[in-house]
Amino acid sequence: MKSLNIYRNKFKDFGVSHKSLQWKSKGAAHQRFRQFWAEIDFDNKNVLDVGCGFGELGNFLTKRYKYVTYKGVDIMPEFIENGKKIYPSLDLEVADYFNHPKGELYDTIICSGALNSNLGTEKENRLFRENAIETMFLHTTNLLAFNMSGGHPSLKNSKENNIYYSDSLEILKYCMTLTRRVIFRQNYHPSDFTIFMYNVREK
C-alpha cells in the first residue's frame, strides 16, 4: 500500500515528528485543528479520529472537552506504538479504516492530514479520496469533518511529490452527492481546505 510506504519512509527519516506525518510544522497542523474547534462542539460526543498519527489531536480534544469520548486509529503501527507512550490515556488502535472499517457508528468523525498522500494517477487519487470520504460518512450519525491539501484552482501535482493537491470544488461536489448539508472553508491557508458534512436525514 503506497500511503503506508510513504509514512513508513518518513518515520524512518524523522521518527516522532510532525515531518513523519507530512506536516510542514506543528503550527501548520494546529492551524488545521483550529478549523474543527471553530465549528464543532465535541462535548458529550463519541469521536473517531481517522489517521490520528501520534494522537496529538486527541490530546487537544480530551484537554479541551471534559466529556468527550475519543478513539484514534491509524494505519501505521509505529505511530500508534509511540502515541500510546506519549499519551497513555488515549484510546489508540492500528487500523486500515478506509479499507476495513468496523461497524461502530460515531457522533463525529474527524480526519486531519490523512487524505493528502500522492498515490499515483489523478484517477487513483480521486477514487481513494472519494472512497475514504464515503466510508467515514457512512459511519457517523451526525458529522464528518476533514481537511485536505489543495484548492481551486488546484496546485500543480508531480509524481515526485508525496503530497497530492486536490481540486477543492471537485471534492465539494462529490461530498454534496452524499449530503446537501455541508460547510466549506478555504480561507485559512492557500493550499488547504476543510469540509464539514452533516448526516441529516431529509424529511
Predicted segments, located by residue:
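N-terminal, positively charged/glycine-rich alpha-helical extensions of SAM-dependent methyltransferases
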Residues: 1-17
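Conserved alpha-helix/loop element of class I SAM-dependent methyltransferases that forms part
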Residues: 27-43
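Conserved class I S-adenosyl-L-methionine
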Residues: 44-53
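Conserved SAM-binding loop of SAM-dependent methyltransferases across substrates and taxa
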Residues: 54-65
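Conserved SAM/SAH-binding beta-strand->alpha-helix loop
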Residues: 76
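Conserved SAM-binding strand-loop segment of SAM-dependent methyltransferases
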Residues: 88-98
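Conserved beta-strand signature within the Rossmann-like core of class I S-adenosyl-L-methionine
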Residues: 140-148
